């Protein structure tokens, strides 16, 4: 199977959700429709549906656009101006969404956007959240995201690529952490 995400986010989601078919996702800061995209594989090989948000509609190197590669909706808009509660309702997303991917540049924007997600109305099974710990001023921002997600019922289970992304499971699913410890040549996965 070909994986498409940059640092293994799609692998982690499939591993923990046991290759789930017909799941749902929200991909904020999705980037390209296929290349280094965290949800392309989920949609195209596992029949997931969802909604993605990015400031720009990127094209692949071959010139293909989102509409050429994907069936799910792309909202081309500044992620910080999106009303996520309305977006989720208008797109008939279930209250229990399988995957939330947050990957905005710079990472400060990911944190600001995280606070806009309606966690009191929606629950996510797994979240990958870009913290990019090697950037200046990262410790405070990382601690804020971790404290916030913990307060919303999520458990930090590890990081990808030495702190590029934090990975969370909803506390109702933490029994899954006993089943897997993910390490391979391409992805550095550290269980916390």
Name the predicted role of every residue range.
Residues 17, 84-94, 114-120:
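Short amphipathic alpha-helix with an adjacent loop that forms part of the alpha/beta core around
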Residues 40-41, 45-49, 95-102, 106-192:
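Conserved acidic-Pro-Pro-aromatic motif
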Residues 11-13, 87-91, 128:
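A broad, low-specificity signal for short, low-complexity segments enriched in glycine/proline
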Residues 13, 61-63, 88, 111-114:
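Hydrophobic packing residues within well-ordered alpha-helices of enzyme cores
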Residues 2-83:
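SAM cofactor-binding core of SAM-dependent methyltransferases
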Residues 22-24, 93-97:
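Short, surface-exposed connector motifs at secondary-structure boundaries
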Residues 79-84, 163-167:
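A short acidic, often aromatic-flanked loop/helix-cap motif at beta-alpha or helix-coil junctions
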